[in-house]
Amino acid sequence: MKNLYIAEKPSVARQFADVLGVKGNAGNGYLESDTAVITWCVGHLITMSYPDAYDPNLKKWSLTTIPFIPTEYKYEVLPDTKKQFNIVAGLLNRDDIGCIYVATDSGREGEYIYRLVDSMAHVTGKEKRRVWIDSQTEEEILRGIREAKPLSEYDSLSDAAYLRAQEDYLMGINFSRALSLKFSNVVQRYLGMDRCVIAVGRVMTCVLGII
């Protein structure tokens, strides 16, 4: 059986490969040796679906359909990263993979990136361990692998990541639609624009206010 290491980006995967002595052509979306397989995400491979994925009628913006608060959230593979997702999903479910080492960035967002892929790939029956490192030096990578804890110990971090993403989604979808429907005509006339969307976001709006 082989170990599978999944990094957040190709550059980090290459560093893991160098440390573990895994050679090969990265153009295939992964690297492989007799004992290990190393692959990577390219940042986010999965995104939250827009409202029209729940109901086609929600594609049209209307004050009567907000707030939009789904009881269960839908996710989909990003079109630009579908090829890499299929590669990663296939590796995660390979019969000869015994243990998955999650080596996405050590933090909430890195946790979220892997958990979404894991969920969409329907990975079951595999041992999963979390590599938590502070740098990509050889010593730190080896320590992180050696001391990797069961992925389940990071479930609370995963829950926090999902909730943060859902908060951002609800705020962006609902407030952007509400403010655009109410005030876009005024902004269009003032700026001499043909069309205007007033985008609202948890971070974006705060930064704009500071500027």
List PLM regions with ranges:
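Intrinsically disordered, low-complexity regulatory segments
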Residues: 1-177, 206-209
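Prokaryote-biased recognition of long, low-complexity C-terminal linker/tail segments
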Residues: 168-211
